[in-house]
């Protein structure tokens, strides 16, 4: 299985493999009674809704998605902080994941993020943006010059034989990186819930929205129920 959804100018999320389906959590829950369904029925939907509504989440950790994510380094830093935050909170129920990232010690970076516009700093929220910078052309020139200088210096260092592990340290956070991320349904929904909301950075919101679309495709019934119970009520 391989489906690629584009994000930003050069990024994407590629689904490599999926473990389980909409029946997986309800059958996992029924194991206590030795029951098992072969087709997803209205009865299964009611059980799945009950499990989600009453926060019986362990059955939803049997559904997994393996994906390749290509994103700017500043987006991936936020993403990994989310993953690590889950992992190190001992009483949090969503620790299940695997994360492996491409290494600049072995490969040369070539893709860099270029935004469509340049946002202004919010006056009310120190970590958010609001509206656009008045001088868009000037901002673009500064962005391009800073990025070009870093890239040219990086390439020259590689040409002169400098170790990649050292030369990469001057690259801007706009450099695109790649990771393999395998996570449970519950872990992914937790990420979407926290990152597809107005106070998150715009770029990571875009990845969260694409991820939501992917989940509606691979686990349609379970995702719709989760959205109905937790997200639609908040809107």
Task: Please report, for each region that a protein language model flagged, where it lies by residue.
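Family-specific signature for flavin-dependent thymidylate synthase
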Residues: 1-235
């Amino acid at each position: 299985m391989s489906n690629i959804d584009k994000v930003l100018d050069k990024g994407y999320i590629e689904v490599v493999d999926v473990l389980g389906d909409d029946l997986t959590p309800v059958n996992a829950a029924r194991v206590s009674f030795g029951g098992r369904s072969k087709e997803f029925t209205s009865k299964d939907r009611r059980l799945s809704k009950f499990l989600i509504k009453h926060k019986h989440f362990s059955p939803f950790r049997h559904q997994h998605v393996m994906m390749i994510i290509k994103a700017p380094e500043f987006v991936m830093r936020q993403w990994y902080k989310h993953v690590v935050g889950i992992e190190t909170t001992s009483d949090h129920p969503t620790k299940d994941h695997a994360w492996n990232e491409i290494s600049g010690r072995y490969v040369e970076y070539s893709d860099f993020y270029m935004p469509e516009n340049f946002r202004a700093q919010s006056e009310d929220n120190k970590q958010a943006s609001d509206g656009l910078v008045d001088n868009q052309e000037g901002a673009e020139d500064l962005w391009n010059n800073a990025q070009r200088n870093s890239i040219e210096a990086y390439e020259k260092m590689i040409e002169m034989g400098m170790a990649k592990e050292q030369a990469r340290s001057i690259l801007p956070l706009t450099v695109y990186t790649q990771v393999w991320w395998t996570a449970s349904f519950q872990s992914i929904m937790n990420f979407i819930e926290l990152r597809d909301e107005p106070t998150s950075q715009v770029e990571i919101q875009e990845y969260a929205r694409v991820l939501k679309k992917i989940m509606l495709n691979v686990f349609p019934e379970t995702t719709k129920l989760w959205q109905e119970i937790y997200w639609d009520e908040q809107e």
